Amino acid sequence: MPGIRLLLAAALLCCPPPAGATSWWSLAQNPVQRPEMYIIGAQPVCSQLSSLSPGQKKLCQLYQDHMMYIGEGAKTGIKECQYQFKQRRWNCSTVDNTSVFGRVMQIGSRETAFTYAVSAAGVVNAISRACREGELSTCGCSRTTRPKDLHRDWLWGGCGDNVDYGYRFAKEFVDAREREKNYPKGSEEQARTLMNLQNNEAGRRAVYKLADAACKCHGVSGSCSLKTCWLQLADFRKVGDHLKEKYDSAAAMRINRKGKLELVNNRFNLPTVEDLVYTDQSPDYCLRNESTGSLGTLGRLCNKTSEGMDGCELMCCGRGYDQFKTVQVERCHCKFHWCCFVKCKKCTEIVDQYVCK
């Protein structure tokens, strides 16, 4: 990508902000507006984004039209994280500052690994689609080669999601902060940097791997005698499900004297570039703890009959739960009327709900 690596090299001369203090994820909270909306003569928006590292600010200045979509990607990743963990003690809750997730991300846990991966995946997803939609000046439709297993009579063309460009740009931008760091070999700080880079890559690979051919039929009366196919991103829920499986099988790692991550337990297989890794055990997230950033589970809804993580016994960490009644309003007794609408009544139901003490 022209100019990006030179800009990143120059950015290495600058001093990075304190680890974990801020994050580009905050672009999800404060989306950057389109460049054409800036007031002429105003200070460039990139210099005002304190959550970006020096290298990321350089990329922002060069690719300002990309920033809105980086924010969208971060928002997509955060939303998916909250969906995947909604029934867990840690539910990917955010805080109202530029760290986005608070101090909990300073722990090199499985949860941190997933968050880095799904956020990086969100950027690939958003940039790839923006290319296809003609929103960015430096990319367009996908130019990926025809899949070998595509039916020989089908046409390969159309305007596909540009996953190649999305992957490359996300790698340069998201990894920039980690690449600017120069910690002592074998240090805990270096271990965390390598962990972040591994998980960022796993997230990007998930989007790349799950993208597939989509086709449209042509022919007389929809006979589908001919198809035109193109590359299309997978639904992001599929990416989230894939990364959640990687979370469940994440590898515990430690740093060695050579400055490389190695398995804590050699009986397991080495992680591939598609796997998540972590360096710290997760806190239990049961109680609010300012030092770890845990918000605790006080007041969380739980399922009285479930034996899973959403069950009251596990969610409430054995502290017990309170029961209360709530009124739910739902559509009911729906009927189709000619032509052509459905008319429903509203039904109310009193249901029991349970919250952790």
UniProtKB/Swiss-Prot annotation:
One GO BP annotation here? cell fate commitment
Tissue-specificity statement: Predominantly in neuroectodermal tissues.
Provide an example Pfam family for this protein: wnt
Principal subcellular localization:
secreted
Q: Write the signal peptide boundaries.
A: 1-18
Q: Which CDD domains match?
A: Wnt_Wnt5b (cd19348)
Q: How is it modified after translation?
A: Palmitoleoylation is required for efficient binding to frizzled receptors. Depalmitoleoylation leads to Wnt signaling pathway inhibition.
Which organism does this record belong to? Ambystoma mexicanum
Instruction: Give the GO molecular function terms.
Output: cytokine activity; frizzled binding; signaling receptor binding
What's this protein's family per the entry? Belongs to the Wnt family.
Q: Which residues are glycosylated?
A: N91, N97, N289, N303
Where does the record say this protein resides? Answer: Secreted, Extracellular space, Extracellular matrix
Q: Where is the lipid attached (O-palmitoleoyl serine)?
A: S221
Q: Which cysteines are joined by disulfide bonds?
A: C81-C92, C131-C139, C141-C159, C215-C229, C217-C224, C286-C317, C302-C312, C316-C356, C332-C347, C334-C344, C339-C340
User: What's this protein's function?
Assistant: Ligand for members of the frizzled family of seven transmembrane receptors. Probable developmental protein. May be a signaling molecule which affects the development of discrete regions of tissues. Is likely to signal over only few cell diameters.
Q: What is the lineage of its organism?
A: Eukaryota, Metazoa, Chordata, Craniata, Vertebrata
Instruction: Give UniProt keywords alphabetically.
Output: Developmental protein, Disulfide bond, Extracellular matrix, Glycoprotein, Lipoprotein, Secreted, Signal, Wnt signaling pathway
Q: What is this protein called?
A: Protein Wnt-5b
Its GO CC terms are: extracellular space
